[in-house]
Structures are given as C-alpha cells and as structure tokens.
C-alpha cells in the first residue's frame, strides 16, 4: 500500500462515514453517493467473490434467493479483524459464522422466513488487514420463478430494486456473469446495458472459468474484444460447491486460483491481471477515482438540501412542545389564520392564491344561487295540461250548480297559492346546498391545522354547530317569506297583467312564452353517449341558442354536425352505466317521435356534476323543461272531461292561466332575489361574525387548552425527520470538508480508451511492444520487471495485449512523489 496516495485512499472511508451519518440518524440517503453495486443472476458467484475479498465465509448460502435485502458491505483496512453491523453498533463480531447468522436473522426480521424481499439495506463493516478500502452493495440475484410466499411478480420487484441503485450516475456496476454460460444472455450485462448503454460505468466479472467445457476459454472476452466495456473484464475462480461444503480455506482457494491462471495456456499471459486480488485492487482504484469525480457534486447537493431546510429548522430549533406561552401564541395564530382563510375562500382569493383548476368556496355558492336554485324552482312547475285541468276544476267547483257568467277571481287565488306553496321546497333545498358547501370550506380551512388534530376537531365542531343553528333560523325565515306571499295576493303590483289584459290575451290566443330572441345561451363540451349512436362516448362542441341546439366537431365551430330545434323538446335525467363516471341527461319529444334519425332521445353527459347542472339550467332559459312525473289516469275518463269543456269555460281557463303565469313571475322573481340574501345574511355572514368575535372564547371554554394544542404524532415524526435529515446533511458536509481539497484538484487518471496512445512527453516514455502475430498466440509474459514486462497498472497496453483492443489496465490513483523521487514501478510524473 506504500505506492498509494494516502489522501486519495481516504476518500472511500469518507463516503462510508457519510453513508453512516444518514443511516445512524434513521434517515434514508436521498443523494447519489458513489458506490459499487454487485449485480448478477442466482448462483452467478456474487457471494463467493465478496467472501474472497474478505477471506472469510460470512454470507448466507442455499437454494433459491439467498440475498433478500441489499447488503452494504464496507471493507476497511485495519490491523484487527472483526465485523460490525450498523444496527448493532459497538458490538464486534469476531466469529464470522455469527456474522452469517446475524445477516439471516436481520433479513428474516424484516422480510419473514419465506423468501420475501425488502429494499431496506443491511449495513456491514468488515475490518481486516487483508482487505483494501472498498464499499460494495450486494443486491438480490435475478430470478424467474417465485418460491415460498413470494409474489408472482418477484422478478419485476427484484429488477425494480436493482434499478433503483444502478440507475444513479454515481453508481459503478459490477456485473457478475458465469463464464460457462452464454454471455449474450447474461442477465447482469443485459440489465447494466439498459442503464449504461455505453458501458462507461460497468465492470465485468467472469466467474467459473474453471468449469468451462474442454477446448473453450474466455480469452477474447477478458481481452475486451467481445461485448466491450470501457472498464474491461476481470476473471476469477471461486470455490466450488464441494469446496464450500468441505469448508475449504479461502486462502487455499486463492492460491489455487493463482495457480490456475498461471498454468492455463489461454490465461497465463494475463495472469497478473486476473484473480480476486487484482479485482480488489481494480475496484479500490476505480471507486476511489469515481468518488473523487463525484464528491464536488455531492457537496453541492448537500448544501442545497440544507439551505432548503434552514427556514423550517430555524422554527424547530428552539421548539418546546410543552411551553405554555408557545401554545397560547400558536392557538391565536391558528384561529386568526383560520378566519382569514374562510374569508378569503368566501369573498375571493388574491391573484397569488386563486385556484385555476376548479371553482371553490364563494364561487361555488354563487353558482348555487344563480344556476342550481333557479333550476330547482323550474323543476317544481307543473306542465300546461296539469295546470289547465286544475284551473278547470277550480272554476267548476266555485260555480257549483250554477252556470258561471264571469271568471271567478277565487280560482286565480286558489291556483296561485298552490303554486307559491310549491316554491318552499326548492328554497329550503338551496339552504341545504349552501350549508353543505360552507361546511366543505370550513373543513378544508381546518385541515391547515392538521398539526394539532384536537384543535382542528374542536374548532370544526364549534363552527359547524353554530352554522347548523343558523341554518334552522334561515329555514324558518325563508318559510316566513313564502308565508308572506301566501298571506296577501297583491294584484295591484305594477308588473301584474290584470284581468282586462289577461282576458284580451285569452281571446287573442297569445302565447305566454317569453321571446328570448335568437341568442347564444351556453357553449361547451359534452359527450354523445348513446351506445348505438356512436362507438363509445365522443366529445363534441355544443352551442345552445334560445331556439336550437347545434353541435360541432371542435370549438372552432367550422364543421357543424347537426342542429336540433328546441320547440317541444323535454329534458330528463338518466343514470350512467355500471362503473361509469359520466353524469347524463337526455333530450326527447314527449309524444315519442324520433329526435334524431332513428333515435328517440339524445343522451348528453360529462364527468362533472356541476357542469351538468349548469347545462340543465341553461336549457331552462331556452324553454326546455324537465320531464314531469304524472299520475296515471283512466284514459276514457280524461277524454270525457276534455271533450266536455265548453268555449266559455275554455276562455275562463285561459284567462286564469295568464293571470297565474303573470303573478308567479313576480313571486318567483322575488323568491330568487330574497332567498340568496337571507342565506347570506343569516348563515354565511353570521357564521363569519361568530368566528371573528366568539370562536376564541368558545375554545377557551372547552377547558384544557393544553390538550387542544397537543401536537399530532405524524407532525412530530415529520419534524424529527426533518431535523435528522438536516443534522445528517450537516455532518456529511463536515466529513467531506475534512478531505484534502488539494488532492481533489489533481487530474484523475484517464478512463480506458478504445485505442492505444503512448504517454505524453516525459523523462522516460514507455516503449510500445510489438503487436502479436495475426491469429497466433502470444508467448508467455516474462517475469515482472524484466525486458518486455507489461506496463504497471495504470499504463495503457498495446492493442494486441491482454486487455487491449479497446481496453486498458485499470488506472492508478494519482500520486505525489516523495523526497526520494517517484515510488518504484510508477511512471514518472507528466
């Protein structure tokens, strides 16, 4: 280790300490820490590679999925040999069989004993004089078939877990593949290629080289000539199952691995660049350089995270949950803010707070007053036939046995009072709708106090209870308004038509229908949802005018599809299909004739119920009224009554009809005007005044204000989590600041390139050996240091040399020469 730059070697422990800073504080790392993730299929040899690094058997083994949680393995060079788990900090494991047992127990504690998996990692630190500083993440092996209680999508779950690690640009990928399988079908390389298509972050590891079929070898792969990776491949030979069962010593296995490569004719020329020891050195160097490159970005990310949290942390820094003064101040602030939020919701928001997605608060109440309430009133009107029949009965019953010569005004009063009484139901329904909407506003504004759930619940209870009291008062007052209209029939009203004008209209047969002119009432998107009309629901642009309904392909209104005259058209609600989110209504002719081609009704709908109500209110303005539910009567009796009316009675019926229509317009106009005013004054405004003047007093009357200001467990956890994250970031920045920044300023060694270039000018450039003869086999490498010896690690090999042809020896970390000049076996400085 004397040839290594100690400042650079400190980088791996720095990242380990940063990782621990987050883990110890119970905070997940939301930053992309530099690391190496070990990826491979089941039985690819991942565990054996890691055990060879440590020199001990310490990982669980068995059939199926053995690694069921990510294992963050931190190898730390130390004179003593022991292991330590982060979840058992301070407890040293010197028996590595106990380490294996602890991994199994900790895995089962989270995932259960039936092969379940979890993304929550286990942190294990191994101290040993036989390891280089290195951090790896052992991930579950890729599998195809679920076992035990594993879900059917276990393959996708493992794949997603692996991708969460290797998707990060700061993560190097150690792709472990058995050499006795087809590399083209390697799960590890395939997954690595998805996230690293250029092979810049992937290091290939070939295992089971000793198990390849006779006459085959992996020379071209190890020389990076097939499936090239910028960081190349390293071959290793692990213990077989027989060796593991026989408890073969790992040191003996490493010696056997070395002998295998030296003696094998296909690998002996590159034996110095194969094996577990070389792989460990390579990973140490590449991870060190990788950390060096990413550390400034990590520092910036930590600083940004801290700056984003500073405002909230400053609020929490001196936080005392049981301080009475703080509780009183918080209570006053919460109530004041609640009142302001209610007022803003009802009266309207500022430009900064206005919602652009949907109507809310006061806007919804406004729509109830001016769209929904008029629609409910019109729904209560009876149709012409029903009204004329009632007028006829009233006139006959008033005349009795006598033959009436004049139109009786008592018939007008009886019919008008019946119609006025019917206005009470929609008026009270308007109150219910507004109260429900106001309750929603109160609930939404109270949700801002979720930090104090008892205060929120108590405040909401007090305000809603008061609002319900005001609701009853409002309903009584609205009932009185209707009673006022019933108490006195003001036939001298300036807008009332009078008997003389009514009789004139009756004699002329004029229609009482108001002429709106050919004006546009509403435009918007609706779906034509007749199943047989179009295939599925299709949105069209509809334009409603006072006498017709047209629809177009789009809102440019260039391509008109159809225009439907509204004369005689009725409207009815229809239910949507099963699991349908569409609200629908239909247009039809009461006499049953087709409304469009062969279809007797036109079904229109959209997903928003409020939009449907607005459309139905617009149709009312155009004179399209809802379908009435009539009692079934005997047709013969109805025909007899219809044919028995004489011309004089018919004129009297028409006169009363015109009088009732004129008077009801006056009353309806009054009701439409007074009911919203009564609701606003008696409910909305009075509730607002109550909250400003009396709400705080009612809260103090509840008794224990300390209990009201008890913080929710969720909020406490949120605060603690933020403080943990803040302190973890602060600690991580402190750790990073200890790194010698001049070391970080050095130029890192170059990545492997696809061609060979001699070193730049220097005191002693490295000579380029002659390329191997085409198709021939290179002679065995001479001893290290002799003529023709391979360049030391960190120097580029010739194209024909092992690891050449697009590869390179793994780069060394930069060094500073000591007083005596460059260390041995190192290239002179550039």
UniProtKB/Swiss-Prot annotation:
Residues 40-47 are annotated as: G1 motif. Signal peptide: none annotated. Residues 30-296 form the Dynamin-type G domain. Its EC number is 3.6.5.5. Keywords: Cytoplasm, Cytoplasmic vesicle, Cytoskeleton, Endocytosis, GTP-binding, Hydrolase, Membrane, Microtubule, Motor protein, Nucleotide-binding, Phagocytosis. Residues 760-801, 811-830 have a biased composition (Pro residues). Residues 138-141 are annotated as: G3 motif. GO terms for molecular function: GTP binding; GTPase activity; microtubule binding. This is Dynamin. The lineage of its organism: Eukaryota, Metazoa, Ecdysozoa, Nematoda, Chromadorea.
């Amino acid at each position: 280790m004397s040839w290594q730059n100690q400042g650079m070697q400190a980088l791996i422990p720095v990242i380990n300490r940063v990782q621990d800073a987050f883990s110890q504080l119970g905070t997940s790392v939301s930053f992309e820490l530099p690391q190496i993730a070990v990826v491979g299929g089941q039985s690819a040899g991942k565990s054996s590679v890691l055990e060879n690094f440590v020199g001990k058997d310490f990982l669980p083994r068995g059939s199926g999925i053995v690694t069921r949680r990510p294992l963050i393995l931190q190898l730390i060079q130390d004179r003593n040999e022991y292991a330590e788990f982060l979840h058992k900090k301070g407890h040293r494991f010197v028996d590595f069989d106990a380490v294996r047992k602890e991994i199994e127990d900790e895995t089962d504690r989270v995932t259960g004993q039936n092969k379940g998996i979890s993304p929550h990692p286990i942190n294990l630190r191994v101290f040993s004089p036989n390891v280089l500083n290195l951090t790896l993440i052992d991930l579950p092996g890729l599998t195809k078939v679920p076992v035990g209680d594993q879900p059917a999508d276990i393959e996708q779950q493992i794949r997603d877990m692996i991708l969460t690690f290797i998707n990060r640009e700061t993560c190097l990928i150690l792709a472990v593949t058995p050499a006795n399988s087809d590399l083209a079908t390697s799960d590890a390389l395939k997954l690595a290629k998805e996230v690293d298509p250029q092979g810049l972050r992937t290091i290939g590891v070939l295992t089971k080289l000793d198990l390849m079929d006779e006459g085959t070898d992996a020379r071209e792969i190890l020389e990076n000539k097939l499936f090239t990776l910028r960081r190349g491949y390293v071959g290793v030979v692990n213990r077989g199952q027989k060796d593991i069962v026989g408890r073969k010593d790992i040191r003996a296995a490493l010696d056997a691995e070395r002998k295998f490569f030296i003696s094998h004719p296909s690998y002996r020329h590159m034996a110095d660049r194969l094996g577990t020891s070389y792989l460990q050195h390579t990973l140490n160097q590449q991870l060190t350089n990788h950390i060096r490159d990413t550390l400034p970005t990590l520092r910036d990310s930590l600083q940004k995270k801290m700056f984003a949290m500073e405002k909230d942390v400053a609020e929490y820094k001196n936080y005392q949950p049981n301080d009475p003064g703080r509780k009183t101040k918080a209570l006053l602030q919460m109530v004041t803010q609640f009142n302001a939020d209610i007022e803003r919701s009802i009266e309207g928001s500022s430009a900064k707070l206005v919602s652009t997605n949907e109507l809310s608060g006061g806007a919804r109440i406004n729509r109830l007053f001016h769209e929904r309430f008029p629609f409910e009133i019109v729904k209560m009107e009876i149709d012409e036939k029903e009204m004329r029949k009632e007028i006829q009965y009233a006139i006959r019953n008033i005349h009795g046995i006598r033959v009436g010569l004049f139109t009786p005004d008592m018939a007008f009063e009886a019919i008008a009072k019946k119609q006025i009484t019917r206005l009470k139901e929609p008026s009270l329904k308007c109150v219910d709708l507004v109260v429900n909407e106001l309750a929603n506003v109160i609930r939404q504004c109270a949700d801002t106090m979720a930090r104090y759930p008892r205060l929120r619940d108590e405040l909401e209870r007090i305000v809603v209870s008061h609002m319900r009291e005001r609701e009853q008062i409002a309903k009584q007052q609205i009932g009185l308004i209707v009673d006022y209209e019933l108490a006195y029939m003001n036939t001298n009203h300036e807008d009332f038509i009078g008997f003389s004008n009514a009789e004139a209209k009756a004699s002329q047969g004029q229609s009482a229908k108001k002429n709106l002119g050919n004006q546009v009432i509403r435009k918007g998107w609706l779906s034509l949802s007749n199943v047989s009309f179009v295939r599925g629901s299709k949105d069209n642009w509809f334009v409603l005018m006072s006498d017709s309904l047209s629809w177009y392909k789009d809102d440019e209104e260039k391509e008109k599809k159809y225009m439907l005259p509204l004369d005689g058209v009725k409207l009815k609600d229809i239910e949507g299909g099963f699991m349908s989110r569409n609200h629908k209504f239909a247009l039809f002719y009461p006499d049953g004739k087709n409304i469009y081609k062969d279809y007797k009704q036109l079904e229109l709908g959209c997903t928003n119920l409020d939009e449907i109500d607005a459309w139905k209110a617009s149709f009312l303005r155009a004179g399209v009224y809802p379908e009435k539910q009539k009692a079934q009567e005997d047709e013969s009796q109805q025909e007899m009554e219809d044919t028995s009316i004489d011309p004089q009675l018919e004129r009297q019926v028409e006169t009363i009809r015109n009088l009732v229509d004129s008077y009801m317009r006056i009353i309806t106009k009054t009701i439409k005007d007074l009911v919203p005013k009564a609701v606003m004054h008696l409910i909305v405004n009075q509730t607002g005044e109550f909250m400003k003047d009396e709400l705080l007093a009612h809260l103090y009357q509840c008794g224990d204000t300390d209990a009201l200001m008890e913080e929710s467990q969720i909020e406490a956890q949120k605060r603690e989590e933020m403080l943990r994250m803040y302190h973890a970031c602060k600690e991580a920045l402190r750790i990073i600041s200890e790194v010698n920044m001049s070391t970080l300023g050095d130029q890192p060694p170059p990545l492997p390139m696809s061609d060979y270039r001699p070193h730049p000018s220097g005191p002693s450039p490295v000579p380029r050996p002659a390329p191997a003869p085409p198709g021939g086999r290179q002679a065995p490498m001479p001893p290290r240091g002799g003529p023709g010896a391979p360049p030391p690690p960190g120097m580029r090999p010739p194209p024909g040399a092992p690891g050449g042809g697009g590869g390179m020896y793994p780069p060394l970390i930069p060094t500073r020469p000591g007083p005596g000049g460059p260390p041995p076996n190192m290239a002179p400085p550039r």
